[in-house]
Amino acid sequence: ERIQAVLALLGRGRLLRRGVFLADGNALALSEPLLPLLELVRAHFPGEPVMGFLDLFTGLKKAPSWWERLGGMGLRRVYIGLETGHAPLLALLRKPGHPKEVLPLVRALKAAGLSVGVILMVGAGGKAFAEAHFRESLALLAELPLGRGDVVYLSPFREDPGTPYAALGLAPLEDLEGELQRWAQAVRRL
């Protein structure tokens, strides 16, 4: 029923869509409950590529065979919210683990034949972290086995008032658009 409702909502606009994005914040972390969902997607959207989001630290708990299985069910791309390659900034953002932990995850995804979308938050940490965030994120990207079909997303970070992050009082970047351009140029050179 839910899929029929979505199809009705999209109407002819569905023809503009290329693939199915599992829009839960961490859909690929579901493990076994994900399998019937992928079967439904395959039945209602035959041949359409499936994409989903995964946080880095949940993905580390999955065996390479899991990713191969999902690839066989239509999964084509996994988006990873890496956020930064700078460990102190990752800790400040209250994310567990170390940025380098993305290396074995991306290797496993690539070995399973999946493409990867790496998401970095440009501007996170403000002025205090800008250079280390830039330098270490690019160095980590250079270590990843990315290739054709993979994507690096540079997401502009904007502070929301009243959040724990805002309470830190970090001075934001003065020119976020300029910083995004700097990152984009550097990523293209990798």
Over which residues does each language-model region extend?
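Flexible, glycine- and charge-enriched loops at secondary-structure boundaries
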Residues: 1, 95-99, 127-134, 169-177
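A short acidic, helix-capping loop that chelates divalent metal ions and anchors anionic groups
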Residues: 87-92, 127, 161-166
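Core AdoMet radical
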Residues: 1-31, 42-62, 75-102, 115-117, ...
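Conserved C-terminal portion of the radical SAM core fold
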Residues: 77, 100-163, 180-189
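Short aromatic-enriched loop/helix-cap "lid" or pocket-rim segments at secondary-structure transitions
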Residues: 34, 64, 130, 163-167
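Aromatic/hydrophobic pocket-lining residues that form the small-molecule binding cavity
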Residues: 3, 34, 63, 102, ...
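Acidic (Asp/Glu)-rich catalytic clusters
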Residues: 10-14, 41-45, 67-75, 107-111, ...
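N-terminal active-site wall of soluble small-molecule enzyme domains
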Residues: 36-39
